[in-house]
Amino acid sequence: MKTTYDPTAKFDLKVTEVEYRRAVSGRMLMARVYQPQGGGPFPVLLDLHGGAWNNQDRTANTMMDEALAKSGILVVAIDLTRAPEAPYPASIQDVNYGVRWLKQRARDWNGDPTTIGALGSSSGGHEIEMCAMRPEDPYYCVHKLAEAPDLDATLNYVATRSPVSDPYARYLNAEKLGRAEMVQNSKNYFNPWDTIHDGNPQEILDRGEKVTLVPLLVMQGELDDNVRPAVQEKFVASYRAAGGECQYELFAGCEHLWVREPGPQTDRAHETVKQFIARQLKAKRLAGDQQSARGEDPRRIATDPLDHES
């Protein structure tokens, strides 16, 4: 049966949890599975929490995860290694493994792994941008998936909310504002300190590195003084200039964490992500139909991004 997605649909949910791997500290990294109850198969979304690389877990984005899953998306939110346990690139290694793990497990929850995309919030947005841009980087692919060793971490699309697209600019802003905890969070994660430049999506584009550019959604609060709009808009412009497709949505009157509270702008964020995903899945179906018409195997795109490398 073909996977379809109607962003206006309504489904009941079954929510379960499963361990997906262990952090170097020994902490169980859990995955929370939001499984629509219905015919399926359903498109698949991996969700990555924020927390300045030092805090939070898979429950941080519950309101968004539930809203998306109730529209007919298999949403799986995962814990990530925190900086006090291990610095960069440990959490991005989790993400890379998590993408491959979810591709391998999606059918267990009535999901279609060929549709996989990801959602990242704040530092989770940074981590998924890094993983999506460098899906096959040996630095990030260190955790082997014995059950499916040939799977890779490529994605069809990425949606973000307040992503830390330039962690060095965010650090300088925190230093200027006297936010000692935020400054220390950056130092905890980027250790040694020069890794803040290697693991920096904006600087990667500035250096002209050869990276994968999947369709990207960036949602940004107008009043965000944590990740400033001007910094985000520079990244969006750089992503487009490098050949990537990027939808940028500014949310008037909103700060960094606006989606945590119910309201019209939170509802708008939910709908923006749904419509973005619907467009990407439609594009994927069209690409598959064109491959079939040419006599090619449309299943090949199971691990290929919708966009090409740039």
Language-model features: where?
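Short beta-strand/loop motif that positions the catalytic acidic residue
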Residues: 212, 218-220, 224
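Short amphipathic alpha-helix adjacent to the substrate-entry channel of hydrolases
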Residues: 59-77
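Alpha/beta-hydrolase active-site loop
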Residues: 86-107
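Conserved alpha/beta-hydrolase "acid-adjacent" motif
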Residues: 225-234
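N-terminal cap/lid segment of alpha/beta-hydrolase-fold proteins
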Residues: 1-39
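Mobile cap/lid helix-loop segments that gate and shape the active-site cleft of serine hydrolases
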Residues: 4-10, 133, 137-141, 145, ...
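Short beta-strand element of the alpha/beta-hydrolase
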Residues: 41-51
